[in-house]
Amino acid sequence: MAEISRIQYEMEYTEGISQRMRVPEKLKVAPPNADLEQGFQDGVPNASVIMQVPERIVVTGNNEDISFSRPADLDLIQSTPFKPLALKTPPRVLTLSERPLDFLDLERPPPTPQSEEIRAVGRLKRERSMSENAVRQNGQLVRNDSMYGISSLDAAVEGASEDMSVVDAASLRRQIIKLNRRLQLLEEENKERAKREMVMYSITVAFWLLNSWLWFRR
């Protein structure tokens, strides 16, 4: 309900605006610090200007005279001639001139004794670092092998203990099954014994009752 009333209000509002609001054809311009109401009362007509969109806007200083009909920068731009630029189309195929691959070595300066010594020292350092890395890698391999052996031994011990636990669990299960069977047999024997005792007790009681009745009859 509230939504319908809001839509109706908006329609009435837009309709009222479209019917009542009008764009003026002229705007009256009054001098600064002038009283418009007094001017209307005195009957002094205010200046009116027809609204038109200017073709361009020129910005000048405070006391400069607008003597030119167009901006100076546009005149400068249009007065300076542009030099034509010649552009060449790039080739479709790029070719490399035949030249030996070792031309860079040929262009290098001849080695000096100092550079030879520096190269020899660098080569020795590289060989030493390579040997140290090889020793470290071998040590790491030996350590990894020992750790792998210890871990495999632990795994074997754990596997054996797990196997023993599985065997123990199976044997315990068998013993429990046997004990259950024995208990069931004992319970059945006790039930049969109780039945026999009840029968024997009832027979003896009947026998004593019959004897006592016969004795009283005599």
From Swiss-Prot:
Homodimer. Interacts with DNM1L. Interacts with C11orf65/MFI; the interaction inhibits MFF interaction with DNM1L. Residues 167-198 form a coiled coil. It holds the Pfam family Miff. It is found in: Mitochondrion outer membrane; Peroxisome; Cytoplasmic vesicle, Secretory vesicle, Synaptic vesicle. The lineage of its organism: Eukaryota, Metazoa, Chordata, Craniata, Vertebrata. It comes from Rattus norvegicus (Rat). It comes from the Eukaryota. Belongs to the Tango11 family. This is Mitochondrial fission factor. One of its GO terms (cellular component) is mitochondrial membrane. The chain crosses the membrane at residues 199-216. InterPro entries: Mff-like_dom, Mff/Tango-11.
